[in-house]
Amino acid sequence: MEPFVVHKGKVAGLDRANIDTDQIIPKQFLKRIERTGFGQFLFYDWRYLSDGTPNPHFELNRPENEGATILVANENFGCGSSREHAPWALADYGFRAIIAPSFADIFYNNCLKNSLLPIKLPKEDVAYLLKQAERADYELTISLEQQVVFDDEGFTSSFDIDPYRKQLLLKGWDEIDLTFVYEPYIIAYEKKRS
């Protein structure tokens, strides 16, 4: 996994609440187990019209949102069924962070396990970011180390994150990588027991 220390990127806004995992990645695209290739199906039912052409009215299809790496949405993002494919699709599309007032618990944890940073900010800060995201050139900087989000215009907001998850993200590790850190101790223990 790629470490997340500081990230500066273009912001796309999706001013909707209760975006569920079936909207993030519809069930018909869940037939694979690899973590890549899901970005093309992200928000599929919103991004494409019934004839398969891109929906020009959907936020992420607008030219000004091309290349966005930070998504700002409203409360209860990632609700619905537990599917790890949802953070896979968001990450594969190119997002490094999702900012919202609240997240569904399982989705939030699935993001952290897949190097996608979910950031909870106050509603008024999210409202400001959604308004700013209407501009084609709006960028944010996220410092995970300092636990702060800021722009070049004076906006700043801090966020909380579990210290254990923070360290894994900073190092670009998942739980398996962490196990390898303790491998010498595991081997020594096994030798002692045999």
Swiss-Prot record:
Disulfide bonds: none
Alphabetical keyword list: Amino-acid biosynthesis, Branched-chain amino acid biosynthesis, Leucine biosynthesis, Lyase
Catalytic activity: (2R,3S)-3-isopropylmalate = (2S)-2-isopropylmalate
GO biological process, one term: L-leucine biosynthetic process
One Pfam family from the record: Aconitase_C
CC terms in the record's Gene Ontology section: 3-isopropylmalate dehydratase complex
Molecular functions (GO terms): 3-isopropylmalate dehydratase activity
Enzyme's top EC category: lyase
Family: Belongs to the LeuD family. LeuD type 1 subfamily.
Its job: Catalyzes the isomerization between 2-isopropylmalate and 3-isopropylmalate, via the formation of 2-isopropylmaleate.
The name this protein goes by in its record: 3-isopropylmalate dehydratase small subunit
Originating organism: Anoxybacillus flavithermus (strain DSM 21510 / WK1)
Protein's gene: leuD
